[in-house]
Amino acid sequence: MQPGGDMSALLAQAQQMQQKLLEAQQQLANSEVHGQAGGGLVKVVVKGSGEVIGVTIDPKVVDPDDIETLQDLIVGAMRDASQQVTKMAQERLGALAGAMRPPAPPAAPPGAPGMPGMPGMPGAPGAPPVPGI
């Protein structure tokens, strides 16, 4: 085996995963989700990037004397679309992002210098008192 062979393979794998993640992010950004409220009386179309690209309001809910209901329906439709975008992102990117996480760092060895509470360190149980305290 040549020196650095494992590192080269690891780097190539990381670059492939990064490319897959970028492609998945681009697909997500270009995807569309449809949110609705009031049983479909208000509908919105939102891209995976969060950009609102369409709003449809059934004329039945347009009442000049009750603007608050229409406002609530629009907010509800937007919330529905936002939740769908989040779910889609988790489904598409979750597995890829998890595969790209670096391994956890090794635990510090016992007796690591400068760790509070270590025997013999000032202020630790059974250790000499800290001057001035």
Swiss-Prot record:
Localisation per UniProt entry: Cytoplasm, Nucleoid
Comp. bias (Pro residues): 102-113
TM regions (residue ranges): none
GO MF term set: DNA binding
Superkingdom assignment: Bacteria
Disordered, as annotated region: 98-133
Pfam families referenced in this protein's UniProt entry, alphabetically: YbaB_DNA_bd (PF02575)
One Gene Ontology term, aspect cellular component: bacterial nucleoid
Keywords: Cytoplasm, DNA-binding
Protein family membership: Belongs to the YbaB/EbfC family.
Subunit structure: Homodimer.
Record-linked HAMAP family: DNA_YbaB_EbfC (MF_00274)
Function: Binds to DNA and alters its conformation. May be involved in regulation of gene expression, nucleoid organization and DNA protection.
Name of protein: Nucleoid-associated protein Rv3716c
